[in-house]
């Protein structure tokens, strides 16, 4: 072998068979030009590890200025060659490439790197796309109270992506209306409905499952589960039949959103025999279906939910996803399921770099949340969309959750522009400290009625009682015998309505807005600053999704070059959001 060294440039050990003359090989690292965008593209300290082969132009010569290179790299459908020219690094489309051979002739240039095409529909696991009838491995997660609206779900379905309707917190009537609309509007397109764990309202969870089964909702997103429940297992097992090979074929599919290993283990395994026996005894599934369920995981897809808005354990994505992938592999080896569970990532997917990182770590698909609430199709209000558009990464805080208030479970919400988190925490502290409303010191009760309730405790209790008489009368039986339960239900009235005030843009309640949001919202705002997506009125879910996926392709192209030893200046990589027309031109 021969080692070539020139001032400022270190080349690796190059086999003599691939060596080329010093005149052709030598170049000096070129600094980016700070005074103009059309600068040489190489960064300082660039190292070319090894010449891959040789490249010869056809009709187009290599380009070396950053504007031209940016255009080529941004054309993600085009295969590219990175070569060494007499004037430095060049990038070219087309031409002839020869790998692993001696220099074929003087018209050939040293080939430093190659970039194959990478398009948005190539990201993720194609099995996820096939299973759900999608073009892209991209999903919008369910945001409760209809924030994950039917509008979002329809837009996603028509664009070849998967949208999940935010059924949590809604009445059976509202959910039924959404089913009617989406089944009529997305006849041959994919859609998903949320099923949230409701430990304080098990009857409502059962009623939602009954509705989904009766109306033929074939795909649900299960969220906030701490353990499997009989209604959830019933949904999965109902309709099971043996396939041609005897393996179970599920009619009802589940996307499980989890952040804990112990919960993920339950979804990546068959349902427990105890729950299956309970369902068989109740006549809700057949013995044959229960037997088939013993060789079927509880979910088809599992979302590793990192630091997200709403219910979250604030897990870091960079550790959570690999952990879930390893757990899936271990349980797949144990159970030998016919189709392995696919693992996606949610929480922090708000920039091209975030999406690219997820796919690079092995995510089968990505799920977005907070950024969709800021879009015009969300079930939120213009006031909330403006608040979200101003949020930074540090403008989030944890606050008590309405649906699991008594358990001390918290949700991540927006802190900027609202006092909800502080006021909700005060209610939780009073609940923990006192056995009843009457036991709370009078000055404290006055403040709660003035700031949070804006009415007397008994007036709010009357409203709350009327609500549960319709929704779940069994809750009232507990409240009639336990004053602490009664107090909790009134406090949950405030927590529950605070998100509805935000969704409706209630002008007199802005300081009480509960806006579920993760730090990804701040990252998104930083990414779109100075672009057409900076304005909340321009934020459409499909445009946001396509820009994230396209930008991820560009980021992955950059990473591919870096792995081959070629480091280009930042301006060579177009990751800023594009208008729909500009994006269409790039993807031609």
Please state what every model-predicted region is:
Residues 40-340, 353, 370-372, 404, ...:
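Active-site entrance/lid segments in N-terminal catalytic domains of soluble metabolic enzymes
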Residues 342-350, 368:
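Glycine-rich beta-strand-to-loop/alpha-helix junction loops that act as flexible
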Residues 318-339, 351-359, 376, 389-393, ...:
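Non-transmembrane, aqueous-exposed alpha-helical and coiled segments at domain scale
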Residues 200-224, 396-440:
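C-terminal domain-closing interface element
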Residues 415-479:
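C-terminal catalytic or substrate-handling cores of phosphate/nucleotide-
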Residues 173-175, 307, 353-412:
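Catalytic or ion-translocation cores adjacent to nucleophile or general acid/base/metal-coordination motifs
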């Amino acid at each position: 072998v021969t080692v070539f060294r020139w001032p400022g440039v270190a080349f690796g050990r190059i086999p003599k068979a691939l060596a080329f003359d010093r005149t052709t090989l030598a170049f000096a690292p070129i600094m980016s030009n700070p005074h103009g965008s059309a600068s040489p593209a190489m960064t300082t300290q660039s190292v070319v590890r090894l010449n891959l082969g040789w490249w010869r132009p056809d009709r187009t010569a290599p380009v070396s200025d950053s504007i031209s290179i940016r255009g080529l790299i941004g054309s993600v459908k085009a295969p590219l060659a990175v070569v060494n020219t007499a004037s430095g690094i060049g990038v070219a489309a087309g031409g002839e490439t020869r790998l692993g051979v001696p220099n074929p002739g003087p018209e050939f240039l040293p080939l430093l790197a190659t970039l194959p095409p990478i398009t948005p529909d190539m990201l993720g696991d194609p099995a996820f796309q096939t299973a759900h009838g999608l073009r892209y491995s991209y999903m919008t997660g369910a945001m409760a109270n209809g924030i994950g609206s039917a509008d979002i779900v329809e837009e996603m379905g028509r664009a070849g992506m998967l949208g999940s309707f935010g059924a949590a917190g809604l009445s059976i009537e509202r959910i039924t209306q959404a089913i009617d609309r989406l089944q009529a509007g997305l006849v041959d397109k994919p859609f998903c409905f949320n099923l949230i764990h409701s430990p304080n309202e098990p009857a409502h969870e059962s009623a939602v499952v009954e509705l989904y089964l009766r109306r033929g909702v074939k795909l649900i997103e299960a969220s906030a589960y701490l353990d499997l429940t009989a209604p959830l297992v019933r949904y999965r097992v109902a309709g099971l039949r043996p396939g041609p090979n005897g393996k179970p074929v599920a009619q009802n599919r589940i996307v499980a959103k989890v952040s804990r290993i112990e919960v993920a283990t339950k979804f990546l395994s068959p349902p427990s025999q105890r729950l299956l026996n309970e369902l068989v005894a109740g006549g809700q599934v057949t013995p044959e279906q229960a037997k088939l369920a013993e060789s079927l995981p509880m979910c088809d897809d599992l979302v590793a939910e990192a630091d997200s808005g709403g219910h979250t354990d604030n897990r870091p994505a960079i550790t959570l996803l690999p952990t879930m992938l390893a757990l899936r592999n271990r349980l797949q080896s144990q159970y030998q399921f016919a189709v392995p569970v696919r693992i996606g990532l949610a929480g922090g997917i708000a920039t091209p770099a975030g999406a690219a990182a997820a796919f690079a770590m092995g995510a089968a698909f990505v799920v977005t949340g907070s950024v969709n609430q800021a879009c015009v199709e969300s079930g939120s209000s213009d006031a909330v969309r403006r608040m979200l558009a101003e949020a930074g990464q540090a403008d989030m805080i944890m606050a008590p959750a309405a649906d699991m208030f008594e358990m001390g479970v918290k949700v991540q919400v927006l802190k900027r522009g609202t006092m909800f988190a502080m006021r909700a925490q005060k209610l939780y502290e009073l609940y923990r400290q006192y056995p009843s409303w009457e036991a709370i010191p009078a000055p404290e009760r006055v403040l709660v009625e003035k700031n949070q309730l804006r009415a007397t405790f008994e007036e709010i209790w009357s409203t709350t009682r009327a609500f549960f008489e319709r929704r779940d009368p069994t809750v009232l039986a507990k409240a009639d015998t336990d004053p602490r339960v009664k107090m909790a239900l009134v406090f949950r009235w405030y927590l529950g309505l605070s998100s509805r005030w935000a969704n409706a843009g209630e002008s007199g309640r802005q300081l009480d807005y509960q806006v579920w949001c993760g730090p990804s919202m701040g990252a998104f705002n930083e990414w779109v600053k100075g672009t057409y997506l900076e304005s909340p009125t321009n934020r459409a879910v499909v445009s946001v999704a396509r820009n994230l996926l396209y930008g991820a392709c560009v980021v992955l192209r950059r990473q591919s070059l870096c792995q081959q030893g070629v480091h280009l200046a930042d301006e060579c990589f177009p990751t800023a959001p594009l208008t729909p027309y500009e994006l269409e031109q790039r993807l031609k």
